[in-house]
């Protein structure tokens, strides 16, 4: 059975989703309110995680352990390293990496997560296709791109760092 977890770091990022869902239960875990219900006849759990990778990871683990979600959508605002993206455009993640992971002193590549043997985390192809189709159907005037998402607990403003990440 498909059950989708929808995460937003800030209330502003999830309030619209919550307003369209039929909520059957609200469960509080680790200070976060998980809204369980349906959205367009699909089982969903919507939650505001708080800002940062640690909060997102904690939230994701609760979604997996307590709610047994099969898929996760992380929604919200973000900065852009891509000059072709404007405010209001949509970027669908083809892959993701931690831009501030650095254990090169132990022989790993920049961004590589120890003992995982990789630094990129690939998106599910079916979810990519469905997300792009949904975006185009709902609002065909908004630019939609598929590309890399990088995550880090810092803001990147240095041009050389930006170029390395994209």
Predicted regions and their residues:
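Short, conserved "active-site rim" segments that organize catalytic pockets and cofactor/ligand binding
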Residues: 2-21
């Amino acid at each position: 059975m498909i059950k989708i977890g929808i995460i937003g770091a800030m209330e502003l990022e999830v309030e619209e989703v919550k307003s369209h869902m039929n909520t059957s239960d609200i469960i509080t875990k680790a200070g976060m309110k998980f809204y369980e219900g349906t959205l367009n006849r699909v089982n969903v759990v919507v939650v505001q995680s708080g800002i940062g990778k640690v909060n997102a990871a904690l939230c994701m683990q609760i979604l997996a352990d307590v709610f047994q979600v099969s898929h996760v959508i992380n929604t919200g605002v973000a900065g852009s390293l891509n000059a072709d993206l404007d405010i209001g455009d949509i970027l669908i993640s083809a892959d993701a990496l931690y831009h501030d992971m650095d254990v090169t002193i132990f022989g790993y590549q920049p961004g590589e997560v120890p003992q995982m043997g990789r630094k990129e985390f690939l998106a599910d192809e079916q979810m990519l296709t469905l997300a792009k189709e949904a975006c185009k159907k709902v609002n065909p005037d908004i630019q939609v791109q598929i590309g890399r998402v990088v995550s880090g607990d810092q803001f990147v403003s240095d041009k050389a760092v930006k170029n390395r990440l994209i």
